[in-house]
Structures are given as structure tokens and as C-alpha cells.
């Protein structure tokens, strides 16, 4: 992607480094429980059980597919932007070194890719995790046409800094000639700031699922 090498301010450069705790990386301010490799399907910390969460995710994924089925045909260089933790990967409910895909989102993304959409991830995880993150995404069968990781300074700036970084990433994607037809995330900072035709919000239970 244009500026993907030089755009260090957006944290796009893929760097080989030991990964940080995945559960701490995509929040900008808070950490998640778990991270030991054991699943927490019963929820905890005020979260609902996995069965309720995945049902709610499936509802949003179906809404997104209905919209994209009408929008993708004829779109010029369509792209879908996604957050990663608890949007694309089951970071809270199934933490571990290789985090499983969220099945309804994976199915949506694979279908959209087959319809000609580029799949671009914009995550709050620091850019030094990009290689690790991309390896996880591809291992669970996500297509990856682009991956933006945040500068380390973003994590210390809280949700406002995360929102600014993610907005700038979408501006950069548009600068590469893409039309962002959908932006999917589970936190307000994933979706605020515009530069997407439509947003789809997955549950975050008032910030408890970051």
C-alpha cells in the first residue's frame, strides 16, 4: 500500500519482535482477563457467556452481509476495514498464542473477499506485533490485504489517541484509492471519525469487552 513502508507514524511497518500480550494490546487503556491459553466461555467480569455473545455477533454479521450484497457490485476498489481483538479474533473468550477467528466475521470476510473486496485490518495492537498478528490472522484463514498497527505512543493516549490513529489509517487507505464500504469494530474508537460509508458495531457491553 502507498506509504506502507514510510508511514511509520501510522505504525504500518511490519517488524519482527517478541509479541506482547495480545489481550493488552487492542484497548488503548485497559487490559483483558485471560491470556493464559485457557478459554473463558462462561464470560466473567460482567460479560455474558460465549453463546450469547456469538449470537449477537452473528446478527451484526448478517446485517453487514445484507448491506454488502447490495453495495459491492459496481463499487470502485471496495475495501472493508476491521478491528482485530474481539472483532475478528476471539481474544477475550478464547485467549492464547493462536487466537481463533470469530466464525461469523470470518465467514463474512471470506465471502466479501470472493466478491472483490479488499480486507484491511486496523488494530490498536502496536506495530511491533504486526508480523505475529498477521501470522495469526492467516493461520485462521483470514485474507489480509493490509494491516495497520499503532505506534507505541497511541497506547498511552487512551481512547482519544486510538480514535485519531484509526481515523488517520482510514484516510491513508482512501488515499490508496480504496472506497471503504464498511468499517467493523466493537469499540466506539474503532468506528468514530468517519471515512467509511457504513459502520457495523459488535457488542462491547459498555466497554467491558474492549
Language model region names:
Residues 2-82:
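Non-catalytic pre-domain segments flanking phosphatase-related domains
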Residues 26-27, 34, 130-210:
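C-terminal cap/substrate-recognition subdomain and adjoining C-terminal extension
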Residues 95-119, 127-131:
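Short, acidic loop-to-helix structural element flanking the phosphoryl-transfer center
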Residues 69, 73, 110-118, 127, ...:
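Sec-exported extracytoplasmic/periplasmic mature domains
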Residues 73-79, 119-125, 149, 181-184:
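Surface-exposed patches in mature extracellular/periplasmic domains of secreted proteins
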Residues 62, 66, 103-110, 131-135, ...:
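Solvent-exposed, polar/charged alpha-helical surfaces in well-ordered, non-transmembrane soluble domains
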Residues 78-95, 121:
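Asp-based phosphoryl-transfer active-site loop
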Residues 46-55, 93-99, 120-125, 156-160:
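Second-shell loop/turn segments in exported
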Amino acid at each position: 500500500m502507498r506509504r506502507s513502508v514510510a508511514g511509520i507514524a501510522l505504525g504500518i511497518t511490519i517488524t519482527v519482535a517478541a509479541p506482547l500480550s495480545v489481550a493488552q494490546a487492542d484497548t488503548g487503556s485497559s487490559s483483558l482477563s485471560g491470556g493464559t491459553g485457557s478459554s473463558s466461555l462462561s464470560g466473567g467480569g460482567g460479560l455474558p457467556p460465549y453463546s450469547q455473545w456469538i449470537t449477537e455477533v452473528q446478527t451484526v454479521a448478517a446485517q453487514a452481509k445484507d448491506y454488502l450484497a447490495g453495495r459491492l457490485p459496481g463499487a470502485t476498489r471496495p475495501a472493508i476495514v476491521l478491528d482485530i481483538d474481539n472483532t475478528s479474533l476471539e481474544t477475550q473468550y478464547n485467549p492464547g498464542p493462536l487466537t481463533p477467528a470469530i466464525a461469523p466475521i470470518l465467514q463474512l470476510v471470506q465471502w466479501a473477499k470472493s466478491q472483490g473486496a479488499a480486507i484491511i485490518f486496523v488494530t490498536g495492537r502496536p506495530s511491533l506485533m504486526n508480523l505475529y498478528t498477521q501470522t495469526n490472522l492467516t493461520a485462521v484463514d483470514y485474507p489480509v490485504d493490509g494491516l495497520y498497527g499503532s505506534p507505541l505512543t497511541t497506547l498511552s493516549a487512551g481512547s482519544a489517541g486510538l480514535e485519531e490513529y484509526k481515523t488517520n489509517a482510514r484516510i491513508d487507505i482512501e488515499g490508496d484509492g480504496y472506497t471503504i464500504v464498511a468499517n467493523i469494530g466493537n469499540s466506539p474508537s474503532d468506528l468514530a471519525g468517519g471515512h467509511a460509508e457504513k459502520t457495523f458495531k459488535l457488542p462491547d457491553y459498555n466497554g467491558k469487552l474492549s
